[in-house]
Design a protein with these regions (language model features):
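Short coil/turn segments at alpha/beta junctions that flank glycine-rich nucleotide-binding fingerprints
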Residues: 95, 111-115
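Acetyl-CoA-dependent GNAT
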Residues: 3, 7-91, 102-104, 108, ...
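Residue-level signal for short amphipathic helical patches enriched in basic/charged
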Residues: 11, 112, 120
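Active-site acidic-Proline motif in GNAT/NAT acetyltransferases
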Residues: 89-91, 95, 123-124
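C-terminal "cap" of GNAT-fold acetyltransferases
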Residues: 2, 22, 115-118, 122-160
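Residues that form or flank phosphate/diphosphate-binding pockets in enzymes
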Residues: 78, 96, 127
Length: 160
């Protein structure tokens, strides 16, 4: 089994949008005001052309199984980026890909000059929240920035 992580390409838009929505449905978090209904979910390649934004695609044996990135979300304080759209299909879990993706994103955030990484999640995503805690993310009492994803009820931040 060959696992790879690479930069997003334009032809990844459709498979990645399907993965995001499939995983959200799996956990019952396919709700309004989340990435599930966000129109940018269908155009990730274009979204991540923004300066200081990076999106990584995870593959197993050449098949796209997920992705995740960092993004300079509007309204975040200077030096803070957001860990965004981190999703893996069920068959990709337990392979260490999630951990590798987060490590890569944190390293990319540092290289791009960020000193903190913020994220938004949901209580239903218990396994993801535990992984973020292991990486040193700490819970916040309120949302930061203007992601527009008011359907998320868990907010975390990590100092790099």
């Amino acid at each position: 089994m060959l696992t790879t992580i690479r930069s997003i390409q334009k032809n990844d838009n459709s498979p990645l949008a399907k993965i995001v929505r499939q995983v959200m449905e799996e956990f019952g978090v396919n709700l309004p005001n989340t990435v599930y209904t966000d129109p940018t979910t269908d155009h990730l390649f274009e979204l991540f052309q923004k300066d200081r934004a990076v999106y990584n695609v995870a593959e197993v044996d050449g098949k796209i199984v997920g992705g995740g990135g960092i993004y300079p979300t509007d309204g975040l304080p200077d030096g803070v980026c957001e860990l965004v759209k981190m999703w893996l299909l069920p068959e990709a879990r337990g392979l260490g890909l999630g951990r590798t993706m987060i490590e890569k994103c944190l390293q990319q955030a540092k290289e791009l000059g960020f000193n903190k990484v913020y994220l938004e999640s949901m209580p239903e995503l218990k396994q993801a929240l535990r992984i973020y805690e292991k990486f040193g993310f700490e819970y916040l009492n309120a949302q930061m920035g203007n992601s527009g994803h008011t359907g998320c009820q868990k907010w975390m931040i990590k100092v790099l």
